[in-house]
């Protein structure tokens, strides 16, 4: 069974973007390439259990086992040594990526307190969009009782678009609620 968001992309977004930007080929139309979820756990330096809990939460949110990220170099001010585990990340592609994006847009973002849309300034100039989430509780998989500490995460949506304008139209077509 094809994903609801993928069908919307094929049936509605591709024709709309082709008309707006005058693409000659369907392959020239931008698409979402991957979504990277990153959770930096700074307090994992003093307590390794925190990283395990964060990784378990990230696995619940994404439906995929996270990769533990390690410090690249030592920083004395943060009491950090090279090679110490300090975060977790997940790269979603294909079916899981569309499922996550659908869940993010239709369920999770509306659960954010005082939500007025995601900022339009978070594009990087190359058509990718970065979104910071302050608490993991907005995701329906995370139970309030199981959370020991509120942690945020970064969500990077990588697209094949060449410009921010193309990427913005793509994400708007997929239902991303941008602030007015």
From Swiss-Prot:
What is one process in the GO biological process aspect for this record?
translation
**This protein's encoding gene:** rplE
Give a single Pfam family match: Ribosomal_L5_C
* Name of protein: Large ribosomal subunit protein uL5
Q: Which UniProt keywords apply?
A: Ribonucleoprotein, Ribosomal protein, RNA-binding, rRNA-binding, tRNA-binding
What organism does the record attribute this protein to?
Answer: Streptococcus pyogenes serotype M1
Q: Does the keyword Ribosomal protein apply?
A: yes
- Which GO terms fall under molecular function for this chain's record? rRNA binding; structural constituent of ribosome; tRNA binding
Q: What does this protein do?
A: This is one of the proteins that bind and probably mediate the attachment of the 5S RNA into the large ribosomal subunit, where it forms part of the central protuberance. In the 70S ribosome it contacts protein S13 of the 30S subunit (bridge B1b), connecting the 2 subunits; this bridge is implicated in subunit movement. Contacts the P site tRNA; the 5S rRNA and some of its associated proteins might help stabilize positioning of ribosome-bound tRNAs.
Q: Which family does it belong to?
A: Belongs to the universal ribosomal protein uL5 family.
Q: What NCBIfam families does UniProt report for this protein, alphabetically?
A: PRK00010.1
What InterPro entries is this protein classified in?
Answer: Ribosomal_uL5 (IPR002132), Ribosomal_uL5_bac-type (IPR020930), Ribosomal_uL5_C (IPR031309), Ribosomal_uL5_CS (IPR020929), Ribosomal_uL5_dom_sf (IPR022803), Ribosomal_uL5_N (IPR031310)
- Domain of life where this protein originates: Bacteria
Cellular component terms per the entry's GO annotation: ribonucleoprotein complex; ribosome
> Subunit info?
Part of the 50S ribosomal subunit; part of the 5S rRNA/L5/L18/L25 subcomplex. Contacts the 5S rRNA and the P site tRNA. Forms a bridge to the 30S subunit in the 70S ribosome.
Cysteines paired by S-S bonds: none
The record's PANTHER family line, in alphabetical order, gives: 60S RIBOSOMAL PROTEIN L11-RELATED
